Amino acid sequence: MLNKKLADFSLPSTGNKTFRLRDHAGSKLVIYFYPKDSTPGCTTQGQSFRDAHDAFRDAGCEIVGISRDSIKSHESFKAKQGFAFELLSDAGETVCNQFGVMKMKNMYGRQVRGIERSTFVVDAKGVLRGEWRGVKVPGHVDEVLSFVRTI
């Protein structure tokens, strides 16, 4: 997938919209996948992107977050955290599967299928230029922002 043009996709988005990848041609885009709204790690991850949102915008880059949660859950999470970017609902896991982020994980001693925390950077031509899988939140957003500034 890396260094290849992404296939277009569309998902329901907060703000009563539909996100279509093709509508963002001409802008760089960070797509971050996270397991679940309002959980500690996902909240910290979203807050980190929120706090760096202006810097990403100054670098010509938009941000979207994707999980399997409902739009209703996303709207609440977005409002509570003050996110200036949209959250996309992939309840059917179509885009999660396109990016290969669905993994078996250990939760409290048992195997469950869920989203592996991952971030992808798409350039203004729709080409996947960067990917981080199994993300640890501390320092991650700064690393992604530094990369975005190089493309």
For the regions a language model picked out, list residue spans one by one.
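Chalcogenol-based redox active-site neighborhoods
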Residues: M1-I151
